[in-house]
């Protein structure tokens, strides 16, 4: 059964929301701008897809930065970390493919999810 679940994810903004989308394939999470790119949730990523579909190498964040990289503008850092953990729990698995972020090019390049 395909369902939508809304979750409050404050931190970047007071009214931030994430949407869990249950599909036949599994549970995707539409994150909006919390986080705005997958590297925020997965700071050890070493590749990213750019517009047009090319995969490019990127430098992973230093491990001592912690489990997440926060957006540049955060109204509440504690709420932000709580929301990142909530977002991770909403997905099928802790893998970037399950997170549709607001500014990731692979989300623009892909035509169908689930």
Question: What annotation goes with each model-predicted range?
Answer:
Residues 25-114:
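Cap/insert and terminal regions of metallo-dependent hydrolase folds
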Residues 1-24:
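Core dinuclear metal-dependent hydrolase active-site scaffold
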């Amino acid at each position: 059964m395909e369902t939508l679940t809304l979750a409050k994810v404050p931190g970047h903004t007071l009214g931030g929301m994430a949407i869990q989308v249950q599909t036949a394939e599994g549970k995707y999470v539409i994150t909006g701008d919390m986080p705005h790119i997958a590297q925020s949730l997965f700071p050890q990523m070493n590749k990213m897809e750019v517009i047009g579909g090319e995969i490019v190498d990127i430098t992973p964040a230093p491990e001592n930065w912690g489990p997440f990289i926060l957006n540049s503008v955060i109204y509440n850092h504690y709420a932000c970390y709580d929301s990142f953990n909530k977002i991770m729990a909403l997905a099928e698995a802790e893998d970037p493919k399950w997170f549709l972020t607001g500014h990731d090019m692979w989300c623009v390049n892909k035509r169908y999810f689930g």
